[in-house]
Amino acid sequence: MEGDSNPLYEQRFNAAVKVIQNLPPNGSFQPSHDMMLKFYSYYKQATQGPCNIPRPGFWDPVGKAKWDAWSSLGEMPKEEAMAAYVDDLKLILESMPVSSEVEELLQVIGPFYELVDEKRKITQVSDLSTGFGNLLSSPPKCVTKSIIRTMEMNGNLEGYPIKTAETLKVKSIDLEDREDDDDEDEEGERDEVEEFKEVEKASQPKKRVSAGRPKGPVSNGSISQHKGLSNGTHGSKSDLNRQESEENTEHMNHDGGIVELNGHLNSEKDKEEDVSSSHHVASDSDSEVYCDSVDQFGGEDGSEIHMNRSLEVLEESHSTPSSTGDIRSQDDELLGREEGVQHGGEDGRGSRGGAQRRELPVKRSDSSVVRRGRGSRSPASGSGSAGPQQGSGGDGERWGADGPMTENLNEQIICALARLQDDMQSVLQRLHTLEALTASQARSLALPSDYLTTPANRNKKKPSWWPFDVSLGTVAFAVVWPFVVQWLIRVYVQRRRRRIN
């Protein structure tokens, strides 16, 4: 009953001390040394007050660490130390195993989790979101300008569909209706609408070039429609985006015009096959863009300059009041030029097949020809091939130089194969020499030793049973000669005695 008379903070402190003191030494939860030092300092401060004992010597590092932790609390009151002890234990209470001491502590502490009012939290979040609603819903003006500038620099604005601009226009108008309260946002959105209108006006003549299909024949004998603009990346970069290429293909399929190819009339089925083959000829993947060499960038720049000039002429012809026949004839001339630039003077499927056969030894896929707007490399591929190659502004020179490049590549391959053959022959010769040496060594080891020794060595050869390195005759001479010398000396002495007598 004494525990009930104690203050609540002291009861909690005593229960927490029991939990720490009864932790199993090899249990699932093991507090760190820093945590135990903190509990020790709070315990000493709560039970004995401030630290007033001398610091241990250097030979007691554990005592020094405990003294430092205790003395760091300074003049902290006992009640505050008890409360800090319990608060630190609450942080690790969930990770400790449940025992009787933990249950007792939970009963003494009670529910110590923080209660959160969900309704208040929701209203606070909504209040915060209303403040940023204008910024989150409307794109900034600078971002829109940067997007338009990036599209103009990359050349994607030419083939950018007008539907997207109209969709953005509708979205911006909806944003104006929603945010009538903020005058600055309305002005920014009106500026965006005006910018999108300018983009739409700027892209209308380009849309006419990329989507319009005049049905008149082309002067160079190629396909009479805008096949060059939807077939290469020099015009609207449509092959880099598969969706735009599909839209161009659908537009060509629904156009309903008659295609004139080398003086023959083909049906809509032939036109669809031609368009699909131009987009999917020898391509490993529709999403990949193949680049033969670094020289393509210069060619692309030249063709893009040519197309920009042709588009400017189209805009001038569209702005000046002229008859429909003049505009159509002017468009036909421009489309004929661009057809030559994009296809290099191809005269239909036959010339493309010739281009494929020409490129097969060089191991270059025809997809790069279609995707980069490069046509046949053969100078005699069609009737209109000479004109575009001379007037393309940069691609023609590169196309004309591809023939010597192909020959140089073939010569390099032949030289490499000849060197490889020489190296293989030298390796084979060395291998034969090595095999001959190995065979001779094997034969020499297989021959008996009598054929390898000279007659003198054969006579001096020691027997197989002799264990020493010295020959048998040498050993016999070394053993016999003392006896022979002694016998000779004895004979000499006997003869001398006879003479004296």
UniProtKB/Swiss-Prot annotation:
Ranges of Acidic residues composition bias in the record: 176-195
Ranges for domain ACB: 9-98
Subcellular locations according to the entry: Membrane
Origin superkingdom: Eukaryota
Coiled coil: 406-437
Membrane topology note: Single-pass membrane protein
GO biological process terms, semicolon-separated: fatty acid metabolic process; pexophagy
GO molecular function, one term: fatty-acyl-CoA binding
List of residues binding an acyl-CoA: 20-29, 40-44, 66, 85
Function of the protein: Acyl-CoA binding protein which acts as the peroxisome receptor for pexophagy but is dispensable for aggrephagy and nonselective autophagy. Binds medium- and long-chain acyl-CoA esters.
Protein name, UniProt field: Acyl-CoA-binding domain-containing protein 5A
Gene source species: Danio rerio (Zebrafish)
Lineage of producing organism: Eukaryota, Metazoa, Chordata, Craniata, Vertebrata
Gene field: acbd5a
